[in-house]
Amino acid sequence: MSQDGASSQAAESQRAVAKSRSQVLRKMWARKPSQAPALAQSPVMSWPLILVSLLGGLASLLAWNGRTQPDDWASLWVGGLLMDRGLESHLYDADPIDFTAMSGEVWPRLAQEVSAPFTHPFVQNPLFAKALGAISHVMSFETSVAWLLFLSGMAVVVLVAASYHLWFRSTMPWGIAALVTACVFALPTTLNSFWIGQTTPLIVAGVAYGLAASRTRHWLAGILLGIVASIKLTPYALIAVMLFFAYRRRAALWSLATTAVLAVWMFIRVDMSVISDWIDRIGDIGSSVLVGGANQSLASTLATDLGKPDLLVTVVRDYPSHVKTIPLCIALGVVLMVTAVAWLNPVYRFEFLITGAWLIAATFSSILWTHYMLMLVTSVFGLAAMARTRLTRQWPYIGIALLVVLLTFPVTNPIAATPYTGGFMYSGITAMLLTLALMLVVGGCHAFAVHRYGDGDAGEVGAGLGSELAAAETLKFPQPEPMVLFDLRKR
């Protein structure tokens, strides 16, 4: 009797455990998207990461101050001087053939007031020149370069931490952030940004932080993205994608509101003739093909023979139709492939779509400078995040290694090469296209492994006793975000 009682108790215990397991699994699978736990409650920048960013800014300042040739920053600074001194009618004076040369006498005269030897015409929003004109009252050009170096060093840390947070949905450990930042500092794309005084680290870090924080800090992420979009037009493509996601829509609306406020402020503070000149300048760049080794866009590589060998970048207005249609057709095809992979990969749907949109907008634009490659940091973290299934366990890291080798190859290094070096103009577009291909393949394999084998982001789900609990543990990891259109099939 005692043995029968013990066996019956054991059977009841097993039934209770099985029932509890089934109830847990049923509740977790039945959870609605709106009831899913927040994916990004942890801060993008913790206090240790903020300290690391300050140290990164200090390191870049000590390493580069007085050792740069900030031609690009000088162009922005001269634009600010023109606005401040009532010479805004000359803000967009540019040579019709040489993209890097100014026209007239006003630009060269003011360019002599800065220490950079090669300034180029202003192409940004005139409101940006207005802001720089105000800054010129409180600091000299040399002081502004020092501040740019410090802020750029901080921005690299923010870029690394925000890219990690976007894909891994947790705060990046500060020690790993410091190590990765040191590696990013050594990349030629970063060296190029610091050397010529580019604002790209600030722009890219602003975009990455805005995307990572768009779920929890709607107003901050939205305002930041709105400001960046007013300076560089590419983020508008990202804002459009964010509107389709319920948890990101509020940040997108904040972005649109910010750009609207800045647009109204521009029409109030800037003469219509200057705004018209800016619109004409942007339209001229978009309708032309900028050919030269410095511009590594696909259109530039297709029209290499049309450029003047003595010019760094030639503005070509008469070109074969295939120079524009081939990049457009490839871009449309990549858009369809990115959308298809995102459809099949709900866990990383937002991250995949937003990173894909960012890559596509930059890869197939009219201009692709070397310092634009800094945005690939976000994609590298995406490849690492999706490398946690049996089909994507090791070889994505081989792809990352190939990408790093490509970006650090001497022909792409601004210290070891120039835009006139053979092969230089192909390095950027090759890196961008390689990254897009890696994202599509890794994303597709990740989706297939999850659907076919049940692999989760915690690793492969074990078989046998306890496999249900292992699956339940996998569900504790980030859940798919609800999205308009993609989720209609589930309703």
What annotation goes with each model-predicted range?
Residues 369-386:
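Hydrophobic/aromatic-rich transmembrane helices and adjacent perimembrane loops
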Residues 219-233, 237-243, 357-364:
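Membrane-interface alpha helices of multi-pass inner-membrane proteins
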Residues 151-154, 198-206, 231-236, 256, ...:
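Membrane-embedded alpha-helical segments of multi-pass membrane proteins
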Residues 2-5, 13-220, 247-370, 452-457, ...:
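Primarily membrane-embedded glycan-assembly and transfer machineries that use lipid-linked glycans
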Residues 382-491:
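Aromatic-enriched
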Residues 45, 184, 236, 375, ...:
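Hydrophobic alpha-helical transmembrane segments of integral membrane proteins
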Residues 60-61, 226, 383, 441:
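Hydrophobic alpha-helical segments of integral membrane proteins
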